[in-house]
């Protein structure tokens, strides 16, 4: 309860770099998040280059902290891995529906929440 009651939103960020080692550890720890059917319907786009951050800014609602951050993480609902898995087994993926979108969005949100905690 202490963690929940002390939650806050931060809008001012440090420009201190995040090491590859720390980032890798956090991403790996978040992989333990339960997902729908253990399909892990998410991906994380890691962006450090200025040009990449500029191009991704609209997806982050052009928030100024995106271009100023040393690293930007974009958490995405993603069927790519599961689609390839199905196709390699001569199966039709069948994710073109709202329920699949909700499952993937939920997986991405849960992964992101675990990463941030």
Regions found by a protein language model. Name each.
Residues 1-117:
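Acidic, surface-exposed loops and disordered segments
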């Amino acid at each position: 309860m202490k963690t929940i009651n002390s939650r806050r939103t931060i809008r001012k960020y440090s420009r201190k770099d995040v090491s590859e080692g720390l980032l890798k550890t956090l991403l790996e720890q978040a992989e333990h998040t339960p997902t729908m059917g253990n399909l892990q319907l998410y991906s994380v786009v890691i962006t450090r280059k200025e040009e990449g951050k500029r191009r991704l800014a609209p997806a982050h609602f052009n928030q100024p902290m995106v271009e100023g951050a040393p690293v930007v993480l974009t958490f995405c609902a993603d069927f790519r891995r599961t689609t390839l898995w199905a196709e390699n087994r001569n199966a039709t993926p069948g994710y073109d529906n709202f329920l699949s979108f909700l499952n993937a969005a939920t997986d991405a949100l849960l992964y992101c929440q675990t990463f941030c905690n």
